[in-house]
Amino acid sequence: MKQIILTTITILYVSAIFGQTKTNNGFADFNEFKLNKPSLKFDFQLKQRSGGDIFLTGGISNYRLKKIKPVNEVGKVEEKIWGVTVGDSIYINAYPFSKVKGYNLIIEKGYYTYFIGEPARTEKEQRELGIIKPTEKQIMVCCQAGYVILPDGTIKLLRPELLLDLCKDNDDLAKEIKAANFKLENVYKMNDILKKYNLTKK
């Protein structure tokens, strides 16, 4: 009996790590993610970037999809689809909004969905994400950043002023945000505010 249980656990673990599935596991766009109805199916190995890889090439500890099958879909998986699901977790493709290859774990899906990713490095994407203002030029970026996905699918850098605007209809949270005087690097604390706000929308 113990051997059967161990074998079952091993199979489930390997399936989760390698993303092998008989059901659809790829989201073509935001609407599929919102409805939780992936229309695409791939086999792949989900790997978190190692410290050595980050040291050599830069970036953050996000994820890569390896050994993608079918092989003729590699470009699509790396640069075009919205995201993938592995077990109970969802990973958003960073390339469409940042032009940086990799996948980021969705921390919470709700009225406002949020995750931590790498800042965009190109001017067009920096402007669209709110990293720079319309009149500003491209800037050098590094390290990780907080992102929020609005109800219409728009992705924005989670700035303190944006957080206040998103939660302004909740007096208690608005007061908490103002009192906290958040900085851009206070990603996890701002995520906690979004989590509280999402609870009011259920």
Where are these regions (language model features)?
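Bacterial Sec-dependent N-terminal signal peptides
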Residues: 1-24
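Generic marker of residues within folded, mature protein domains
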Residues: 6-9, 138, 180
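Aromatic-patch recognition
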Residues: 22-174
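C-terminal partner/receptor-binding element of secreted or periplasmic proteins
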Residues: 164-202
